[in-house]
Every structure is written in C-alpha cells, then in structure tokens.
Amino acid sequence: MKMDKKTIVWFRRDLRIEDNPALAAAAHEGSVFPVFIWCPEEEGQFYPGRASRWWMKQSLAHLSQSLKALGSDLTLIKTHNTISAILDCIRVTGATKVVFNHLYDPVSLVRDHTVKEKLVERGISVQSYNGDLLYEPWEIYCEKGKPFTSFNSYWKKCLDMSIESVMLPPPWRLMPITAAAEAIWACSIEELGLENEAEKPSNALLTRAWSPGWSNADKLLNEFIEKQLIDYAKNSKKVVGNSTSLLSPYLHFGEISVRHVFQCARMKQIIWARDKNSEGEESADLFLRGIGLREYSRYICFNFPFTHEQSLLSHLRFFPWDADVDKFKAWRQGRTGYPLVDAGMRELWATGWMHNRIRVIVSSFAVKFLLLPWKWGMKYFWDTLLDADLECDILGWQYISGSIPDGHELDRLDNPALQGAKYDPEGEYIRQWLPELARLPTEWIHHPWDAPLTVLKASGVELGTNYAKPIVDIDTARELLAKAISRTREAQIMIGAAPDEIVADSFEALGANTIKEPGLCPSVSSNDQQVPSAVRYNGSKRVKPEEEEERDMKKSRGFDERELFSTAESSSSSSVFFVSQSCSLASEGKNLEGIQDSSDQITTSLGKNGCK
C-alpha cells in the first residue's frame, strides 16, 4: 500500500461512501481530497429541474457529514469550467491522481473524455471506475460483436454472465489533504445555488415526503426487501398507495449501488424459489427486470449516443409530429379532459413524482393521442421529476413512441378510460388529484363525457368550465395517428428507406478516435471507461430470423401477434458505433440520465427483435 499518494476524488452522481469504487481506491492508496464541482453552464439543455436540484442539495449535505465523520471535508466548487476547477484543486493540493466513477449519458461522455485528455496531457494519473452498473456497456455484445437493440436479448446475455459479488465497505478512516479553501474558490452548499428563495416553499413539501442521503437509501432498501418485495408483482397493477420501491431518486444520485440492490433482491428470489413461493419469485423477477431496464438505458445511451435527439429507428425521422404548443400546455397542466392523464400530470407538478404505470399512460397519451414530439415530453419529465434520469427518460420515451425496435407498436393507441378502470377501479387516484371530479360516481369517473347531464350536475361537474372537455376524442385521435403513420410510410418509400434500419449517428464529420499502443497509455487501465468509436460496421440488410419469417407468414394469413411482437424490427446492416477495445486516450472518457427507478419505471415487456 502506498500511503504517500495524494488523490482527488471527484464526486458526481455517486453520493455515497458504501460500495464506492473510486473512494475506496483512493483511501487505500493514501490521502484523499473529496470534491464536488457544480458547473451549470456545462449542463446545457439538461440543467436539472427544481425537484432534482433540491434532492442533490440534501444528498450533498448528507455526504458531507459522512465524510467529515471519517476525517475529511467535502469541498464544494461552483465554476464555469470543470477542468479548470480540477486543475486548481491539483495545484493547491499537490495531488498526483484524480479518480471518479463512470457516467454514461452523452453530455457526461463528452465532458469526461475531455477532462481525462487534459489531465493526461499534464502528466496527471486518471482512473475511473464502474460505480453505477452491474455490467459496463462495452462488455455486452451479441455474437457478431454488435450492440443489442432489444431488451430481452440484452438482459438474457447479462444474466448468463457473472456479477461481482464483493461489496466495498466504507473506509474506516480518511487521511485528508489540507488545502486553503479560498485558494480554490470553495463555497458553501447554499452558495452552489441549487435552490433559490422562490423555490423553498414548494421544496418544503418534498422535505416532509422524502429523506435523501445514502444511509436513508440503505434503510429504505431493507424495508422494501423485507416487507414489500413479495407483493411487488401484485401491487404493480395499483396506482394508489405505496406500490413501488421508491428507490429511483437514490439510484439516480448514486446514494445506493445498483449492485447492492440487485444482490438483495436476488437473494430473496433464491430463497423463494427454494421454498416454492411462486408469488415471491414473480415479484423478485419483475423487480430485477426493472433493474435490467435501468442497465439497458445506459447501454443504449452509450452505444447510440444520439438517442436524446433522434429516434433509434431511422424511418421515424419522417414521422409528422404535431408541434402544437397549446396541446402541449394542456397536457402539462392536466387539462386534457381525460381524468387519469390529468391526475398524473397534476401529481407530477405538485410532487415531482408519478407511479411508473402513470408515467407510461401520460407519455403514451402525449405521443399517440396528441402526436406531440416525444422529445418535448422527455424534456418536461427531465425538468419536473424528482428522480429525473436522462438515460431512463430516453429509453422510456423512445419505447412508448415506438422509436426503438422492441417498443410499443407505432399504431398502438391505449384508451385512458379503460386503463383507468384497470389500474384505478375505484377512482381513488382520480379523486385525490382532481377534486372537481371527487363527487362523480365511480361508474363515470374515468369518462365523465359519457355521464348523463343530471349526474354531472348533481356531482358539481360542468364540462368545459370546471373540468375540461376531451382535447380530442378517441376516434379522431386514432384517425390522426393512422394518417401520420401513412405519411411516414409514404416518405420512406420516396427515398427508399428500409422500415427496420437503426439510425446511423451523424458523426461523419468527425475523425476516428486516435488509437494508441498500450505502452503509450500508462494512465489507462482495463477498469477505465471507454467511449463510442467513430469506426462503423459494414454489412448488408439483416436476414430475418426464422421465427420472424414465420410471423410474417402468419400476418399474411390474417394472424396478428401484435401483443407479442413489435411491428418495428432492428437491422444489423445499419451503420452504428462500437466501443474500441484498444488502449487510447479516448478510452479514458466518461458518461451521460428519467424512467427512473427503472425498477419502478417501464414495466411492460419488451419484444424479441434485435441482435441475437
């Protein structure tokens, strides 16, 4: 053990001391200088919303107290340039190494790659670690060496691999590096500006409902595993009450490691399998599948880093989204005239939270009923959700809009009234968030437009006055969606585009990453994060697997397996990026974040298309 090394630990979305690879490695080698750097300018269009910033502030305060108890202070820095702040820390502390844990979103990938390059150029050792995932995105490929584009195939491959089972305990003591705070422009947590005075009254409601911080995450996980997990599958069909794990914001900010969550649930699954407890097994499997969806969201963002801007399926660039600001405003404000949708959007605005099922329903309504651009909805979720997570948001909205190979069928249009009867049969959720409908009989509460005038009058409901009329009726919405799909197909035919092609990233103008020989990259290790390469695949249009050919034959005979398969298919012929396994400065880069506790986000089954 080298006890003379001075290391800067750069905290980001890994605000914990347990099972934190970067912190553990630095503490093992010598003295540490923990730092959190807040650079609003670098967040760009993905500057966190009010609720997310509130959580970050509370979590940082919790982490700061924990580090102080171990003997080291957390230095907070607000800056206009991250690399400049890190270089200032190096200059003042005399540190010779910088460590941090990986992120996987496009914004972070670019930033972290730049940071590593600049530090390596100055002779500073840089090491990054996997502190967020079970498997790194560059570890999971199909037998052809290409990224999976279907969740089922991806997750099956993951479950066939081993998982690191050793949990890293928190350091028992940290050796601090003393540095003059004023020399590096350190600030207080209030001076970070994560919360302004106008936001504090609204945030007070969050304080009563949530307890951010890594130690609180541990308590919540233990309670969920021991008391609620067994009923997780049964409760997933309810939108009222405490039917989810509520772990999503803790996972987003890295207050608990996904490895710890996975292992706890997996242990219960093994016990229930031994005891032949089928209900428990089903619940554990559903919860673990949610963890897999969170993993998959990072995987997609890493291997297809354009997905926050473009649909993964190339033909959907022709889809005629309706950029109607008035409809978007009505959707945001919960004034669509569809009670379940409106209740969900009002809950989101009031609390920064929605049940995963409600997230699916309101997002589906936005893109299928109103034909609003899915990127608008994704950005609004990012701005308002307490557990806003860009990678999960991207996966969720692309899935719902039919923009990924195993997403919802493009022509799928779910009736909110029927979904309300299924997931809120007594209307409890509606009455909680739409008090103007509280007196309406349960028979009509999910479709008040069908209620007799006498019933509406007796319930104090006047459609168009104190509650909105439907913004669009179902038949009209179905007709408009069909026309949009028809226009999309016509545009495809005009340019000869295949309906199953994966979008090629628009990086033609960029040169390929510089590849160095291993001997020329002394600061790079096998643990370091890699970045997508500009090297492209070659190939021809995908040959359909046998079962897909059979499916197509059945469709031609009038047999539609729409419930089992997506109408979209992936294409291995497309130009996509892969991760270079060679040692390079580029391989030292870092990562990029809403359906949030993916274990609590998209619960629908994904299809079987994609790289096998």
Swiss-Prot record:
Q: What is the effect of changing Q127S?
A: In strain: cv. Bu-0, cv. Da(1)-12, cv. Di-G, cv. Landsberg erecta, cv. Le-0, cv. Lip-0, cv. Mrk-0, cv. Stw-0 and cv. Ta-0
Question: Cofactor(s) for this protein?
Answer: FAD; (6R)-5,10-methylene-5,6,7,8-tetrahydrofolate
PTM annotation (Phosphoserine): residues: S587, S598, S599, S605
Expression across tissues: Mostly expressed in the shoot meristems and root tips, and, to a lower extent, in the cotyledons, hypocotyls, and roots.
What result follows from mutating S587D? Answer: Constitutive regulation of hypocotyl growth in blue light. Reduced blue light-mediated phosphorylation and impaired blue light-dependent proteolysis and hypocotyl inhibition response
Q: Which cystines does this chain contain?
A: none
- Show the Pfam families listed in the entry: DNA_photolyase (PF00875), FAD_binding_7 (PF03441)
Q: Where in the cell is it found?
A: Nucleus; Nucleus, PML body; Cytoplasm
- Give the Phosphothreonine positions (modified residues): T603
Q: Which InterPro entries match?
A: Crypto/Photolyase_FAD-like_sf, Crypto/Photolyase_N_sf, Cryptochr/Photolyase_FAD-bd, Cryptochrome/DNA_photolyase_1, Cryptochrome_pln, DNA_photolyase_1_CS_C, DNA_photolyase_N, Rossmann-like_a/b/a_fold
Q: Do you know which NCBIfam families this protein is assigned to?
A: crypt_chrom_pln
- By what name is this protein known? Cryptochrome-2
The organism's lineage is: Eukaryota, Viridiplantae, Streptophyta, Embryophyta, Tracheophyta
